[in-house]
Amino acid sequence: EPATENPLFNLPNVVCTPHLGAATTEAQENVALQVAEQMSDYLLTGAVTNALNMPSVTAEEAKVMGPWLKLSGHLGAFIGQMTDEPIKAINILYDGSVAEMNLNALNCGVVAGIMKRANPDVNMVSAPVVAREKGIQISTTNQDKSGVFDGYIKVTVVTEKRERSIAGTVFSDGKPRFIQIKGIQIDAEPWAKMA
């Protein structure tokens, strides 16, 4: 029988999931091996499979997306700090090479960055759900315009009174950069204290 009472159930930083099988010792060993293999894949290649707090990403996607995923979180966190009013909509534009990536993971990174200011407990999986529960519309647009950058992400937050935007790219050195804030062109490397 599944446990119905446990002190862990009351901790805010613990997520309990149902037991979905593994009724025999052999099945439990197989599940343990599968979890160990998935953790090994993540640590060695960046691949994420069946995680509760992050969208699934293949090893191939992880190699290319790593810096972009980091950038998406920085963009969200920075624009979240710029926004004091209730958010009505989050519009995310993907341009160039980034538009061909796993946009679900990048969307989650942006929204989690924005939502963490008001709710530090959100993660990449829960943030879009929390945003929708608050009535925030999330939209994405892909375009393939050739310009100065091989690819970039632009995030626009819409409130009752105004729109604010920020854009960023990943340079050839693999480092994320902010390239535009509120329509002003810049070149700034995001720091932990900034985002």
Model-inferred region functions:
Residues 54-195:
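A conserved regulatory-domain signal marking ACT and ACT-like small-molecule sensing domains
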